[in-house]
């Protein structure tokens, strides 16, 4: 085995499991309102029904901002409406969001390139720094794990110094389930018991065999081409297969593909599993896989397009095999693409959008999804329930009869349903204090599971003072992280610093540390940048 092959394999292993440069502050923006009061702004967040800790964090941050003479108001609203404002309309000042530790996010691509490159799919805050653009591109083509790690570490240091965003805390996945009804739950980094591996492995000890799974946000859509939200991915992966999966240990394992062979830095050979069928009985073929790649590239599938743009050619090489030629090496390909991408049935999607009455595939509701995954779609009562049943013909059939996703109006309502046995488990997070309470009840387990996600205060850097790195740094320095960690999160968190969490050990830059809340130092940073205060204590723009 050559040294290069060993390094490449080491890279794949490291990518599947889990060098700081000196930087200069970005140039001071030219303020149109020199020596005028800094205008009030708003912090947008999901309401308490979806996640009660976010508005609580927001209230503490708005109060803390008074210490630097700045007025902020809190806008807590429906989760899906807020997501739309940020990710479609870019109509926001600041935004508190929880970046969940989805399996594909073990790879640093999401938190480095997709969120911070000027053309990144998740860069809705308008950030554009040539140092980060360059590092984001370099880490994508660095096929040796240690070389890529150094680039990712350097990017984390720059992002922290530039305070492009403020990771607030690294929370545990706080979940609860009825252990007197469910067996064999499989927790996973970043997903807790809401993992795909729990979905297919959990057993039901009594009742009809269906697992009532609680969630506090309504499902937005079942379109695998348009999906960007974590909640959508968690439901779609039950219905649609992927070529590979990230297992509970963080290792990439074959799924719909029996093998994915990295021939060289720009060549990938894939062999599709024999005998797979779509839920309507048609055979799954390698032509479906090739169609899925081409189709999602044509329609600019938002989550997948950055990888698909690197696909120079996709060629069928046998009855069940294909070869991908890349235009350049693409390090995130395995975990960020193959472990996330949904295979589509060509015989259905080839006529969409024309026969669906929409002008764009991304607007297609897909209200009767047909996939090849371990669960078959039964019904979707929008805003209330989604029901899927076990696909007993699947190569990895579920051990339960199916899953019913129930939308509850609040965390309290979901916790009450678990307490009385009407709900079997949480899919996503439950308020930490409620987890502690449920853990005291016989037959219920409430616990926090390790995660590489984080709560984040994001800044729209196109707007007013948020364009100024010094101002953002001062904001980062007033966040009362200790109080948020100990009181709001009930201890189920660590203070936030870098955009890659400590739980993601290989990629986390441990030299990037959380800023301690200190209003005086924040004011000193502002003063050094030229900000002043009027007689009423209100913050004024620099000259």
Model-inferred region functions:
Residues 11-38, 45, 52-63, 85-218, ...:
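Detector for C-terminal structural segments
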Residues 258-302, 317, 323-325, 417, ...:
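Aromatic- and charge-enriched surface segment that lines or borders ligand/interaction sites
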């Amino acid at each position: 085995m050559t040294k290069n092959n060993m390094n490449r394999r080491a890279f794949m292993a490291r990518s599947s499991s889990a060098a700081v440069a000196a930087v200069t502050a970005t140039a001071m923006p030219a303020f149109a309102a020199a020596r005028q009061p800094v205008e009030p702004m708003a912090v947008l967040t999901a309401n308490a029904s979806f996640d009660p800790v976010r508005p609580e964090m927001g209230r503490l941050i708005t109060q803390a901002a008074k210490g630097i003479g700045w007025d902020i108001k809190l806008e807590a609203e429906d989760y899906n409406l807020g997501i739309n404002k940020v990710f479609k309309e870019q109509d926001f000042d600041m935004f508190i969001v929880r970046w969940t530790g989805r399996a594909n996010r073990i790879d640093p691509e999401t938190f480095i390139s997709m969120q911070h490159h000027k053309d990144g799919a998740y860069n809705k805050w308008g950030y554009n720094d040539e140092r980060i653009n360059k590092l984001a591109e370099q880490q994508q083509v660095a096929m040796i794990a240690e070389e890529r790690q150094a680039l990712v570490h350097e990017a984390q240091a720059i992002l922290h110094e530039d305070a492009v965003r403020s990771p607030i805390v690294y929370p545990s996945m706080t979940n609860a389930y009825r252990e007197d009804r469910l067996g064999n739950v499989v927790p996973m980094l970043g997903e807790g018991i809401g993992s795909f591996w729990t979905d297919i492995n959990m057993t039901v000890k009594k009742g009809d065999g269906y697992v009532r799974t609680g969630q506090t946000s309504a499902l937005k859509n079942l379109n695998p081409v348009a999906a960007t939200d974590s909640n959508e991915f968690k439901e779609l992966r039950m219905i649609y297969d992927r070529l590979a999966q990230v297992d509970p240990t963080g290792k990439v394992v074959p799924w719909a593909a029996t093998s994915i062979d990295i021939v060289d830095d720009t060549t990938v050979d894939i062999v599709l599993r024999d005998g797979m069928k779509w839920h309507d009985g048609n055979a799954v073929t390698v032509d479906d896989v090739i169609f899925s790649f081409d189709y999602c590239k044509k329609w600019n599938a938002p989550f997948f397009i950055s990888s698909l743009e690197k696909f120079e050619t996709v060629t069928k090489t046998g009855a069940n095999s294909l070869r991908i030629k890349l235009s350049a090496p693409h390090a995130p390909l395995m975990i960020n693409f193959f472990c996330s991408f949904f295979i589509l049935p060509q015989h259905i999607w080839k006529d969409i959008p024309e026969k669906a009455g929409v002008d764009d595939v991304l607007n297609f509701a897909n209200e009767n999804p047909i996939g090849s995954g371990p669960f078959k779609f039964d019904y979707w009562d929008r805003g209330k329930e989604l029901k899927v049943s076990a696909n007993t013909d699947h190569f990895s059939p579920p051990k339960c009869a199916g899953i019913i996703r129930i939308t509850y109006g609040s965390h309290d309502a979901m916790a009450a349903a678990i307490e009385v046995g009407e709900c079997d488990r949480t899919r996503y997070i439950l308020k930490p204090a409620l987890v502690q309470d449920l853990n005291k009840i016989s037959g219920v387990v409430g616990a926090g599971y390790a995660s590489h996600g984080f709560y984040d205060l994001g800044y729209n850097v196109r707007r007013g003072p948020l364009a100024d790195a010094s101002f953002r740094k001062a904001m980062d320095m007033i966040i009362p992280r200790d109080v948020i960690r100990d009181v709001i999160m009930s201890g189920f968190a660590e203070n936030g610093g870098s955009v890659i969490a400590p739980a993601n050990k290989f990629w986390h830059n441990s030299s990037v540390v959380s800023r301690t809340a200190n209003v005086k130092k924040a004011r000193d940073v502002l003063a050094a940048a030229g900000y002043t205060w009027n007689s009423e204590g209100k913050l004024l723009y620099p000259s």
